[in-house]
Amino acid sequence: MPAISRRNLAVFAAACGLLALVPVSALAQPVGDDKALAAALRAGGHVILVRHGATFPDRADTDPFNPDNIAAQRNLNDNGKALAKSFGEALRQAGVPVGKVYTSRFNRAYETATLAGFTDIEKTADLTEGGLVVSPNENNRRAEALRQLLATAPKAGTNTVLISHKPNIIDALGKDWFEVKEGEASIFRPENGKYVLIARVQMTDWPRIAAAAK
């Protein structure tokens, strides 16, 4: 129940303008098709924000103060692990260059990155779910940190990947992400200190995008 209340609060705050939303409307400059999206990502210059892969829905984080206690966390299920691998394989098949990868400190986010085959991975509190175990000010700080990462241009010729959690994504981006699914990617282009959403992709769709790139 506390998690539901928090999400409802996030939506209410967004509606009242208390959360900073994407500086342009969702899909204001969408990429038109799979081939165009693959081409855009091959050129680099994007930030790919991913909610961690599929998990066991009947499990919870029982030691949320200790992200290193993997056994006490809601971890990836077999489908989540398989899709994380296919996500990384699809990016490589499509020739998408991945540079820096930032993840939550929780294992379900970090494992999504490692199974995808990413190498330059850094865990950060900025992407870690705080929920009710950190202060509202800290949750707000993390939301702002996520927005700053979205607005930061990657190293030339690469794309940055961020792997986080639903509450963090809602806090940072608002009510349009209230139904963000496990494994879903929101792809942004940093632009003049802001960020433009160009596509939202489910993890099951990446092999199709890779095929279109050929």
Give the residues covered by each predicted segment.
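Active-site-proximal alpha-helix that buttresses catalytic centers in soluble enzyme cores
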Residues: P30-D126, G130-V134, R142, D176-S186, ...
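N-terminal secretory signal peptides and thylakoid transit peptides that target proteins
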Residues: P2-A14
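Bacterial N-terminal signal peptides
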Residues: A13-V22
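Sec/Tat signal peptide C-region and signal peptidase I cleavage site
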Residues: V24-A28
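Histidine-centered catalytic micro-motifs
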Residues: V50-T55, L162-I169
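A short, structured loop/turn motif at beta-sheet edges
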Residues: A153-T158, E191-G193
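Generic beta-sheet signal
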Residues: G45-V47, K155-S164
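A short, acidic, amphipathic alpha-helical segment used as a generic capping/interface helix at domain edges
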Residues: E144-P154
